[in-house]
Each structure stands twice: as structure tokens, then as C-alpha cells.
Amino acid sequence: MNQHITASQAIADPTHARPDASQDVVRLVDLKRRFGTTPAIDGISLTVRKGEILGIIGRSGAGKSTLIRCLNGLERPDSGEVFIEGREIGRLGERDLQPLRRRIGMIFQHFNLLSAKTVEDNVALPLKIEGRPKAERLARAAELLDLVGLSEKARAYPASLSGGQKQRVGIARALAARPALLLSDEATSALDPETTRSILALLKDINRQLGLTILLITHEMEVIRSIADRVAVIDAGRIVEQGPVWSVFADPQSDITKSLLGAIRPQLPAELAARLLPASGAETILRVDVAGDAASGPLLSDLATSVPGAFRLVHGGIDHIQQQPVGTLFLSIPGSDASHLAAVITFLKARQARVEVLGHVAHPV
């Protein structure tokens, strides 16, 4: 299956150029939406710049689905404004809203393909609804199926496809009308890990080749980590944290972000975590989160030469997110000398590390 996209395969409008990143495709201003007495969206303000991938993450019931319905005009907010390419959709009637919706493509968790239609007919469906000539529809479908690596499946029916292939058809269909914005609503949640990686790689390639703006809704931090440029964390209808992905991963501020990151951030080995005590013991265990220069420099060797006394690295490592080094180290500080422990923590914080005392162990690690 060909997943590589060459310049000759770029299927945007012939006049397409890499968009100006200073312009916003989406701008939300103090958006609010209630269902009864329950706020689904509670004052969200957000921008999505041209050509970027923004990930919106939160637990079930956080307001993600309501937000995406407000973006495509299927849900009217109680107050606030939704701008798509500079147009406030709340001021548009249904007739004016339809052409704007065609500027928005969408892919879904469960694909939403028409089982009685062939793959190429599913891809061409948005163009058929627009009344485009059959020859144009079929030519566009062929381009898109080549893009997503499914040219040989054009005459097949959805029932014969794997889950990953169905989602590729969904992506091709979402691109049929050359949208300015692609909304992805939990598009990989029903897929196995290997297929998820291939779909995310395809979306990233499409973003790079076409400059397509993507807003993806997910509850999986690994999805955000894989392809997003920025992330916004939603809880109870509010944005509790947002920023570049590497920055949020390196230094999460909110409890909900820390919880969502828990599954993919390095953790203290279970056998050592089980030995932690709140009271002083033979050794103190520190968690040290680093990013940027602190992660790429000789932090531990500098600590050894600058602060007299012993320490041990018991677990951890350095990774790269958005080409930025990000890591977590677990250090053991022997003894009960409070001044030595304070000196270690002071040194690490001076190097822009985030330090947390996890507890103590009664016997050496």
C-alpha cells in the first residue's frame, strides 16, 4: 500500500500555496452552550492557524463533541462567536451556511461510509451533492484514492475493507471538496495501534503537502504527541491548558493534563513505587522533568561536579517531541542530610528542571 505523497500527488486547488500562518482558519470567542442546567461549553476562546494541527483532548463528557458540532454549524451556541475563515457562522442562515460547510471536511470514529456504494462513489459523494459532472467526480476520486494508497480498491465495497482502509476512504471523501479545515473526531479510536500510526502518518503527510489545517478531537495523548503542533486540554467545558505540544508534555500545569499524560509519561518502576514512604528514610526519591537545554545538556555530570555528595539515577530517559528534547529522570539521594538534598534540588531548579519529591525508601535502592 503506497502511503508516500509526492509533490506531483498534491491534490489541492491548482492555485494552492502554503498558507500564511498569521491568518486564522478558526477563531472561537467566549463560546458557551448549555443543555438544561449543565454547561457543555463554558466560555471557550481558541484560534486555529492556517496550516497547523491543533489537538483538543479531554475525558468523556468534557465538551469535545459539542465543540466540534458548533464548529461545523450543527449546534448553535447560546452565546459567543464562531469564525471560520473570518466569517461568523452564527450570523448565517442555512442557505449561506451550506457553502461554508463545504469548506470543512470531517472524518469520524466509525467511518460513516455508504455500504451500498463503491469506494470511489463514497469518495465522490460530496461532489455529487454539489452537482459536479460525473467525469470530474471520478477524476477527483481517483486522485484522492491515489493519495491515500487505495487506487486498487476503487470498485470495491466497504464491507471488503479493513478498518484502516475504511478510514482512508473517509479521509479521501473529506478532502473531495478541497476543504480549508479538516475536523477529525476520534478518528483512530476504533483502530489497532499499528493502523492508528499509519492513519496519523497519512494525516501528517497531507498536512505537510497541502498545508491543510487540521483540528483533531481525541482522548488519547499519544495521538496528540504523534502529529499535533499545539494542544488544548478541555475539562468541564473549559480550556484548562493549552500550548505547544512539547511544552505541555514537558511541564503540565493542570491536574487533568497530568492525569491524561499519566499513561505515556515515564513513571517510577512499580516495585520501587510500592516502597515509597512519606517519612524520612535511607534515601529520598526525586522526579526530575527536563526539556530544552536542560534535557540536551550534561545535567547529571554537572550536578555531580557542582554539588558534593552522592546521587543515583534509578530510572528515566530523554525523548524528542516536535524536535525538542523532553525527559524524566528519577534520582535517589542517599542519607538524611537535609542540606545536601536542598542543594541538589536548588541546582536542578536553577537548570530549569521541575523537581518533585516523591517520597523516601527505608532501604537503599
UniProtKB/Swiss-Prot annotation:
<comment type="subunit">
    <text>The complex is composed of two ATP-binding proteins (MetN), two transmembrane proteins (MetI) and a solute-binding protein (MetQ).</text>
</comment>
<keyword id="KW-0029">Amino-acid transport</keyword>
<dbReference type="Pfam" id="PF09383">
    <property type="entry name" value="NIL"/>
</dbReference>
<keyword id="KW-0067">ATP-binding</keyword>
<dbReference type="InterPro" id="IPR003439">
    <property type="entry name" value="ABC_transporter-like_ATP-bd"/>
</dbReference>
<comment type="similarity">
    <text>Belongs to the ABC transporter superfamily. Methionine importer (TC 3.A.1.24) family.</text>
</comment>
<dbReference type="InterPro" id="IPR050086">
    <property type="entry name" value="MetN_ABC_transporter-like"/>
</dbReference>
<dbReference type="InterPro" id="IPR041701">
    <property type="entry name" value="MetN_ABC"/>
</dbReference>
<comment type="function">
    <text>Part of the ABC transporter complex MetNIQ involved in methionine import. Responsible for energy coupling to the transport system.</text>
</comment>
<dbReference type="InterPro" id="IPR027417">
    <property type="entry name" value="P-loop_NTPase"/>
</dbReference>
<protein>
    <recommendedName>
        <fullName>Methionine import ATP-binding protein MetN</fullName>
        <ecNumber>7.4.2.11</ecNumber>
    </recommendedName>
</protein>
<dbReference type="InterPro" id="IPR003593">
    <property type="entry name" value="AAA+_ATPase"/>
</dbReference>
<dbReference type="InterPro" id="IPR018449">
    <property type="entry name" value="NIL_domain"/>
</dbReference>
<dbReference type="GO" id="GO:0016887">
    <property type="term" value="F:ATP hydrolysis activity"/>
</dbReference>
<dbReference type="GO" id="GO:0005524">
    <property type="term" value="F:ATP binding"/>
</dbReference>
<keyword id="KW-0547">Nucleotide-binding</keyword>
<feature type="domain" description="ABC transporter">
    <location>
        <begin position="26"/>
        <end position="261"/>
    </location>
</feature>
<keyword id="KW-0472">Membrane</keyword>
<dbReference type="GO" id="GO:0005886">
    <property type="term" value="C:plasma membrane"/>
</dbReference>
<keyword id="KW-0997">Cell inner membrane</keyword>
<keyword id="KW-1278">Translocase</keyword>
<feature type="binding site">
    <location>
        <begin position="58"/>
        <end position="65"/>
    </location>
    <ligand>
        <name>ATP</name>
    </ligand>
</feature>
<dbReference type="InterPro" id="IPR045865">
    <property type="entry name" value="ACT-like_dom_sf"/>
</dbReference>
<dbReference type="Pfam" id="PF00005">
    <property type="entry name" value="ABC_tran"/>
</dbReference>
<dbReference type="InterPro" id="IPR017871">
    <property type="entry name" value="ABC_transporter-like_CS"/>
</dbReference>
<keyword id="KW-1003">Cell membrane</keyword>
<dbReference type="GO" id="GO:0033232">
    <property type="term" value="F:ABC-type D-methionine transporter activity"/>
</dbReference>
<keyword id="KW-0813">Transport</keyword>
